[in-house]
């Protein structure tokens, strides 16, 4: 895992097309902005895990 330190307003690049910017810090919460092409899915981890779990559940087709 790469660990980086960024200040509010600073950005990091992921590849050529994705940027992650620190928008603010309040207590133990960090607000970040992600700028990515439409074809790149961006989800919070808990949402991504839910999507993956739904994909593996059998569907009822009666």
Swiss-Prot record:
Record-level Gene Ontology MF annotations: mRNA 5'-UTR binding
Q: What's the superkingdom here?
A: Bacteria
Task: Supply one GO BP term.
Answer: mRNA catabolic process
Asked if Membrane is a keyword of the record, the answer is no
Keyword Cytoplasm attributed: yes
Where is this protein found? Answer: Cytoplasm
InterPro entries for the chain: CsrA, CsrA_sf
**Which Pfam families does UniProt cross-reference here?**
CsrA (PF02599)
Q: Which UniProt keywords apply?
A: Activator, Cytoplasm, Repressor, RNA-binding, Translation regulation
Recorded GO cellular component terms are:
cytosol
Q: What is its main location?
A: cytoplasm
Q: Which family would the database say this protein is a member of?
A: Belongs to the CsrA/RsmA family.
Q: Which PANTHER family match?
A: CARBON STORAGE REGULATOR (PTHR34984:SF1)
Biological function = A key translational regulator that binds mRNA to regulate translation initiation and/or mRNA stability. Mediates global changes in gene expression, shifting from rapid growth to stress survival by linking envelope stress, the stringent response and the catabolite repression systems. Usually binds in the 5'-UTR; binding at or near the Shine-Dalgarno sequence prevents ribosome-binding, repressing translation, binding elsewhere in the 5'-UTR can activate translation and/or stabilize the mRNA. Its function is antagonized by small RNA(s).
Assembly information from the UniProt record: Homodimer; the beta-strands of each monomer intercalate to form a hydrophobic core, while the alpha-helices form wings that extend away from the core.
Q: What is this protein called?
A: Translational regulator CsrA
């Amino acid at each position: 895992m790469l660990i980086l330190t960024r200040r509010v307003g600073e950005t990091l690049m992921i590849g050529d097309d994705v940027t992650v910017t620190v928008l603010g810090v309040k207590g133990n919460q960090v607000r970040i902005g992600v700028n990515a092409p439409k074809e790149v899915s961006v989800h919070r981890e808990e949402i991504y895990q839910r999507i993956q779990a739904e994909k593996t559940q059998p569907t009822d087709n009666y």
